[in-house]
Design a protein with these regions (language model features):
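Intrinsically disordered, low-complexity segments
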Residues: 1-4, 37
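N-terminal secretory signal peptides and thylakoid transit peptides that target proteins
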Residues: 3-13
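Bacterial N-terminal signal peptides
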Residues: 11-22
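Sec/Tat signal peptide C-region and signal peptidase I cleavage site
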Residues: 24-28
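Exported/periplasmic ABC-transporter solute-binding proteins
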Residues: 29-64, 68, 72-78, 85-88, ...
Length: 265
């Protein structure tokens, strides 16, 4: 892997609030439960939380990061109310070890895309043919994904690239984001030809304005079955938010960010 140069002004809209707890209602910040949400949910769950607060008057705080890192923090005693994972396997492991109330609920199925910044010589195509051509010609300087060691969207990106036969050849130019939102920042920075990110991020207006994308075939990787669960210490507001996630209003918001929803179709 190669180091990625930082650019202060790049991707400010992408990472606003990333990994930081964001209050939905300042007056209730002290008592509001923390929702630990996978980074692919950055825009979708922010919108859901705003709708939840507007409808119920109850506030939550949002913390975005990689699913694997959150799972580790929960095991170390992090006081989250709800854990919204990008891969249900993490919920299953936590439940087996007694950290969640129950096995939780599937709330969404995610997709991955190849996305390139405006002006990139790389054209996004679902079969990654342009990526292969430019890589063979030595014309890819950097290509971004989330870290597959702990970020499910990085895991699925790796699986897709292995399926396509490009994983090994990309290693010299690969840059890893700590989570998929940071990978999107890297991919759209102008210092990279592009990257593989969450479809839900690519659809957000703040991101869509910065580049173009193509959906990667679902059969190139394992499904992104996204599951949530209440943690053992969750209180009434966390319970209310968890229930709200399953309402038509919340589901409509999630669908608007490209998620397939359990029970549809």
């Amino acid at each position: 892997m190669i180091p990625f140069p930082s650019r202060r002004a790049v991707g400010a809209a992408l990472v606003a609030g990333l990994l930081a707890v964001m209050p939905m209602q300042a007056a209730a910040q002290r008592d509001a439960p923390v929702i630990a949400a996978a980074s692919d949910l950055q825009f979708a769950i922010t919108e859901v939380a705003q709708a939840f607060t507007a409808e119920t008057g109850q506030a939550v705080r949002l913390s975005f990061g990689s699913t694997g890192n959150f799972a580790r923090q929960i095991r170390e005693g992090a006081p989250f109310g709800v854990f919204m994972a990008a891969d249900e396997a993490f919920i299953a492991d936590l439940h087996a070890d007694g950290f969640t109330r129950d096995a939780g609920d599937l709330y969404a199925l995610g997709r991955i895309v190849i996305m390139v910044p405006e002006g990139s010589a790389l054209a996004p195509d679902a079969d990654l043919d342009a990526l292969e051509r430019m890589l063979t010609a030595g014309e890819i300087a950097r290509f971004a994904i989330a870290n597959p060691e702990h970020a499910p969207y990085g895991m699925r990106a790796r699986e897709a690239l292995i399926s396509r036969g490009l994983w090994d050849d990309l290693q010299p130019v690969m840059v890893l984001g700590e989570n998929v939102s940071q990978a999107a920042q890297f991919a759209l920075s102008g210092n990279a030809a592009g990257g593989i990110i969450a479809y839900s991020l690519a659809l957000a207006p703040q991101v869509a304005a910065r580049g173009t994308y193509a959906l990667i075939p679902e059969d190139w990787h394992a499904p992104l079955r996204q599951r949530m669960a209440l943690l053992k210490g969750a209180g009434p507001t966390a319970e209310a938010f968890y229930a709200y996630m399953q309402t038509p209003e919340a589901r409509a918001i999630m669908a608007g960010y490209g998620f397939d929803l359990p029970g549809d179709g």
